[in-house]
Amino acid sequence: MRPLAIIGPTGSGKSQLALDVAERLAGEVPAEIVNADAMQLYRGMDIGTAKLSVAARRGIPHHQLDVLNVAETATVARYQQAAAADIEAIIARGHVPIVVGGSMLYVQSLLDNWSFPATDPAVRARWEECLAELGVGELHAELARRDPAAAATILPTDGRRIVRALEVIELTGQPFAASAPRIGAAQWGTAIIGLDCDTPILDDRLAVRTDSMFERGLVEEVRVLLRAGLRDGVTAARALGYAQVLAALDAGGGAELLDDAREQTYFGTRRYVRRQRSWFRRDHRVHWCDAGATGPSDRAAMVDEALRVWRHVT
């Protein structure tokens, strides 16, 4: 059974559309949803990731949610293997897999069946020591000297990816980009729907979303997760919202600091949306839908369009 992937920037309505599509399909064939949001892999990271509660999932099975502790490191390779196994099992049951998320590398690794360059713990450890000693800025400069193209695509603050790029360059003797797969036919013949809308509309949604997260208890969620090991999490502690609240709490946790954390979360999410758009828009396989209008008739029309594309992929 051919999968459907629903991708796009944060706040575009992907989870809602996935539920609507699954419900529409229910009279014809059961559907199951596979998460492709890296931070929703973590147990307890609910408010800040806009994770659907069990009650909000409408009885539709969901996979790749709440599979990691916050102290564990999420990796694209591990996700790809686990999510692909979920999809294969869903197809074997005669059900439709619906992949939903906006984590760029996670989505593409799954749909393009990436193979990952080997890793060497000793080489990785040496570069991690350099990161600790020199700082992320100097290590990014080193990457720029060795592979300018890779440095241009990796944020100067993303120490983990900088270390990985330098490791791959050292092990393969080739530029980091040489190990990146090209966009080809989507695995399993997956139909890909992209949701987006005009920037002012999405910015307004992100503002409402950010305010709602803080009002619903994001700060307390971070406090609880700190007791579960959040500070030790390489990936979880860097998540948007969580990193900002953690920094505010470390600085004293006063109202002004938390207000600043809220503002930084909003602007950080806007920057992330720009990266998501840039990444996904280069994929010629995506059928884009305008998600600016959200009335009942608009939602029904998006379901119609998603199913039309899903039924006609060859």
UniProtKB/Swiss-Prot annotation:
SUPFAM superfamilies: P-loop containing nucleoside triphosphate hydrolases (SSF52540). GO terms for biological process: tRNA modification. ATP binds at G8, P9, T10, G11, S12, G13, K14, S15. GO terms for molecular function: ATP binding; tRNA dimethylallyltransferase activity. InterPro entries: Dimethylallyltransferase, IPT, P-loop_NTPase. It is an enzyme of class 2 (transferase). The keyword Oxidoreductase does not apply. Catalyzes the transfer of a dimethylallyl group onto the adenine at position 37 in tRNAs that read codons beginning with uridine, leading to the formation of N6-(dimethylallyl)adenosine (i(6)A). This is tRNA dimethylallyltransferase 2.
